[in-house]
UniProtKB/Swiss-Prot annotation:
Source domain of life: Eukaryota
Name of this chain's protein: Conserved oligomeric Golgi complex subunit 1
Phosphoserine found at: 7
Modified residues (N6-acetyllysine): 598
Record keywords: Acetylation, Golgi apparatus, Membrane, Phosphoprotein, Protein transport, Transport
GO terms classed as biological process: glycosylation; Golgi organization; protein transport; retrograde transport, vesicle recycling within Golgi
Length: 980
């Protein structure tokens, strides 16, 4: 408010009349008015300056440039005119008085004045020149000008203790400010020079000039310069490692770090290394640049070829000729001589610097690699380092530099980074496979929960899992590949599979989905890791040495490929074993839960057990990328395995000849197979327990009705016997031709349940174990029967010879069906065989020995014929060696046999084994117990429908058969004879 009042009052005053001003105001008021006027002037100046500077900046700069050019031109004109005048005076003096005796001249005082004036003029212009040199990064030129400025101060006595009483300062007060400003140049030049040392993208000459500036300003030695240079580069390394991390910038940071290390050693060689005596210099490898630059700057050049402080347009000024010689030829000097650094000291210093930076670099790069989340990113960084160092090695003779400086090669990758990359790679691989393992476990648990909900109508796949036969006999669009019509099998994709192939292997959709999800995750992980490994055409485990590398290669990028492959193999095996461990834990839980349950076969827990069994059985086939993870890129083909098998067959193969990767893959497959067999064992144990329970119950029924209900067809045979007198007597005997109904029900139910789970794809060992268990339980049931028969019970049907004969026939039939001849040959006489023989002896003891001798050949014939006829019906539980009749010379052509007839036209049921149309006329048959066959067998199957009883379909077909002579390709003689 006061300022506004004073300004308005000032405007009302007429300042142009000083008399009136002094008349109306006192001295103090006039001084106040003066201050106000000056403040107003300064304010207006500032406003005008801002306005003009904002709007006419370019114009002002152009005007300044034009003014400077005008002054320079005027100076040139004045210098030319002065030269002309001087020459004219010389000519006049020569023509008038050729030889004039030297007279005392009055010029020395004026010349001294001009010299001092020129020095003052130079002193005033040096700050601008220094700033210009600093802006152009010419630190050595700025240092020379600063040292020249200090020299001028000493000449003009501006820096002496009595400088304020100097006559020059008294006449030129502006020099006081100039002296004060010059004192800051030293710290500024030093700071800028040391900052330049921290930059890696600068030339060797620029670094040499910066080091020379530091040495001249600090009066240091070359050893101190080497220390300053290395400390500056160490600070740059710290700065690079501590920058913010942003994804792709990590590659640039690490590459910049490697480039900085390589540049530091190259510049250390170019600056500080000196060649021994007698060694010719190599133009492509400069060295000793610091010492040559120092010598050029500091030594006196009588010919004027040195680098002077005063250069350029300054020499064209008119006052330049008045400068003394000490200023014109000024050269900075060092207090101590710059002796070259010895090679031993240079090597020790550089090695200490490398060791000092080694720990920082490892920690820094390790922290940087924590931000790399993929192995493809690691491979990109490694390849970028390889490209950088390869170019460095090719263009700068890297090996020669390292040999000269360190007397050994400096291996950036092998010594500093390779282990860091391997550690990060191992971490990423472990985390990736742990994630795959955890997600697979979660998927497994969810699949098991879905199977145990018993809501099969909501999910068709779950319905297929509960009954594999529905899946096998249902059609789907994926049964055949979409390109099956025009693409051959050889040209299809490696892992392509059709729906029919899945059905042929009894692989359910749930298992397919699980394996597909697991394989897709493994594929992503494998594709990511393959970027770190050599391509497929490069041998993976080849022992590569640096001597086999290309000449310009910095290091072997794939030297650790074997380690990476082992790491991948270890983690993938651990992943799959973790999944198998989860399956094993689930199996143990289910086994403990179902151990005490009676109706286990109907439990939903068994669906989960079968799912896990199929899963373990199919993982090796449906997850091809799992095999690639374990075996490697070149292990996908089966050629090595085939060759190994061929050698083994020839007796040349040995166990140690198998590759470790192949052996480990075989180990994984065995673990999966063992777990699958364990799961199937849980199912087969429950199945056998359920079926044997019904079989034993029917076998132990001793009342007459039950015995008649389980009886089947017997044959009457006429035999001729020779009496003691030599005459022949014809007699009739009756022998069983079919097993009891509960035996057929037991076998048929067993086949049904095996078919329900896809029995054609069950492991052979599972079927063998199941049949062994069945046989052992059957023998135990018969042992229990014989023990109970020894105890007389009221109302029990006595053990007659006919019943004993039927029991013997049943037992021998079960033995022939459930036993495997191949296994018997391999294992020799087993415990079950001895029990079987004892049981057979007990039953034979109930039959008359004479009758037994007569019955045995015919009984054996009936058994063999029955086994052949039922080999198709019970094919899944009979061994393959039992499905074909052995060739014998006693073959009866009148017997029907199971062969497929040749037909010229397509028959309706092409897959049914049709017998020949011949009939058994030679053998007299009787159907005395035909009525017993019409009685239904006891209900042993878990379904109450009578159509599911064994033999019901064949009885229906036989009842429809008539004796019509009309020819037909579909004859049911073999079917009807099975039911007789």
């Amino acid at each position: 408010m006061a300022a506004a009042t004073a300004s308005s009052a000032l405007k009302r005053l007429d300042l142009r009349d000083p008399n009136a001003l002094f008349e109306t105001h006192g001295a103090e008021e006039i001084r106040g008015l003066e201050r106000q006027v000056r403040a107003e002037i300064e304010h207006k100046k500032e406003e005008l300056r801002q306005m003009v500077g904002e709007r006419y900046r370019d114009l002002i700069e152009a005007a300044d440039t034009i003014g400077q050019m005008r002054r320079c031109a005027e100076g040139l004109v004045d210098a030319v005119q002065a030269t002309d005048q001087y020459c004219a005076r010389l000519r006049q003096a020569g023509s008038v008085a050729p030889r004039v005796p030297r007279a005392p001249q009055p010029q020395p005082p004026s010349e001294k004045f001009y010299s001092m004036a020129a020095q003052i003029k130079l002193l005033l212009e040096i700050p601008e020149k220094i700033w210009s040199a600093m802006e152009a990064s010419q630190h050595l030129q700025a240092t020379q000008l600063y040292l020249l400025c200090c020299h001028l101060h000493s000449l003009l006595q501006l820096d002496s203790s009595n400088s304020r009483y100097s006559p020059i300062l008294s006449r030129f007060p502006i020099l006081i400010r100039q002296v004060a400003a010059a004192s800051h140049f030293r710290s500024t030049i030093l700071h800028e020079s040391k900052m330049l040392l921290k930059c890696q993208a600068v030339s060797d000459q620029a670094v040499a000039e910066a080091l020379c500036s530091i040495m001249l300003l600090e009066e240091s030695s070359p050893r101190q310069a080497l220390t300053d240079f290395l400390l500056a580069r160490k600070a740059t390394i710290q700065t690079l490692l501590n920058q913010s991390h942003h994804g792709a910038g990590i590659k640039a940071q690490i590459c910049s770090l490697v480039e900085l290390l390589a540049t530091t050693l190259n510049q250390a060689h170019a600056l500080f290394y000196t060649l021994p005596e007698g060694v010719l210099p190599d133009p492509s490898l400069p060295c000793g640049l610091l010492f040559s630059t120092l010598e050029t700057v500091t030594r006196q050049h009588p010919t004027g070829k040195g680098i002077g402080a005063l250069q350029g347009e300054m020499k064209l000024c008119s006052w330049f000729r008045h400068l003394p010689t000490s200023i014109i030829e000024f050269q900075p000097t060092l207090r101590t001589l710059a002796h070259p650094i010895s090679q031993e000291y240079l090597k020790d210093t550089l090695q200490k610097w490398i060791d000092m930076c080694n720990e920082d670099i490892k920690n820094g790069i390790g922290n940087l690699l924590m931000y790399v989340k993929s192995m493809k990113g690691l491979a990109g960084i490694r390849d970028a380092i390889w490209d950088l160092l390869s170019n460095e090695s090719a263009s700068h003779s890297w090996e020669v530099v390292c040999q000269r400086l360190l007397e050994k090669p400096l291996l950036f990758w092998e010594d500093l980074m390779q282990q860091l990359f391997l550690d990060r790679l191992q971490t990423l691989t472990r985390e990736g496979f742990e994630s795959i393992s955890n997600s697979s476990k979660e998927l497994l648990v969810s699949a098991l929960q879905e199977l145990e909900t018993n809501n099969s109508t909501s999910n068709k796949h779950v319905h297929f899992e509960q009954n594999m036969s529905f899946f096998l006999w249902s059609e789907s669009p994926n049964d055949l590949p979409s390109d099956a019509a025009w693409v051959s099998v050889a040209n299809r994709a490696q892992f392509a599979s059709s729906g029919l192939s899945m059905k042929a292997q009894a692989i359910s959709p749930c298992v397919q989905n699980f394996c597909s999800a697991l394989d897709s995750k493994l594929k992503v992980k494998l594709d990511d890791l393959l970027a770190y490994l050599p391509s497929s055409d490069t041998p993976l485990l080849k022992d590569t040495t640096p001597t086999h590398q290309p000449k310009n290669s910095a290091f072997d990028r794939y030297a650790d490929a074997g380690t990476v492959q082992d790491m991948l193999r270890t983690q993938s095996v651990a992943c799959i074993k973790s999944v198998v461990g989860c399956i094993q834990a689930e199996l143990c839980t289910i086994e403990e839960v179902t151990r005490e349950q009676k109706d286990v076969l109907h439990s939903t827990k068994l669906h989960a057990v079968l799912f896990m069994a199929r899963l373990c059985q199919s993982l090796g086939e449906l997850c091809p990328h799992l095999k690639q993870c374990v075996v490697g890129q070149c292990g996908g083909s089966e050629k090595p395995a085939r060759e190994a098998r061929a050698l083994k067959k020839q007796g040349k193969g040995r166990a140690q000849d198998v590759l470790p990767a192949q052996a480990q893959w075989q180990g994984v497959k065995e673990v999966l197979l063992q777990q699958s067999v364990m799961a199937y064992r849980v199912w087969s144990t429950a199945l056998v327990k359920f079926l044997i329970c019904g079989f034993t119950r029917s076998l132990l029924l001793r009342d007459a009705g039950s015995v008649l209900a389980t009886a089947t067809n017997w044959d009457e045979l006429e035999i001729q016997e020779e009496t003691e007198s030599g005459s022949s007597v014809t007699s009739k005997i009756r022998l069983p031709t079919q097993p009891s109904w509960y035996v057929q029900s037991f076998l048929f139910s067993l086949c049904q349940e095996v078919n329900r789970v896809g029995g054609h794809a069950l492991p052979k060992v599972t079927l063998q174990e199941m049949l062994k268990t069945c046989m052992a339980q059957v023998i135990a049931a018969y042992e229990q029967l014989t023990e109970e028969n020894q105890i007389k019970k009221e109302g029990a049907f006595p053990m007659t010879q006919n019943r004993a004969l039927q029991l013997l026939y049943d037992l021998r039939y079960l033995t022939m069906v459930l036993s495997s001849k191949g296994e018997e040959v391999k294992s020799g006489r087993s415990k079950a065989d001895s029990r079987m023989e004892k049981m057979t002896e007990r039953l034979e003891a109930l039959i008359d020995p004479f009758d037994l001798d007569v019955f045995t050949p015919h009984l054996n014939s009936n058994l063999n014929r029955l086994v052949q006829r039922t080999s198709v019906l019970f094919g899944l539980v009979t061994g393959t060696e039992n499905q074909f009749a052995s060739r014998s010379s006693t073959f009866n052509s009148q017997e029907p046999h199971n062969i497929l007839p040749l037909a010229s036209s397509q028959i309706r049921f092409g897959l049914l084994p049709l017998s020949m149309t011949s009939t058994r006329k030679a053998r007299a048959t009787s159907r005395s117990v035909e009525t017993q066959a019409q009685v239904g067998p006891p209900a042993l199957s878990r379904v109450g429908d009578p159509t599911t009883h064994p033999g019901s379909l064949f009885r229906q077909l036989a009842s429809e058969e008539d004796d019509s002579p009309a020819p037909s390709l579909f004859k049911l003689a073999w079917l009807s004879s099975m039911t007789k």
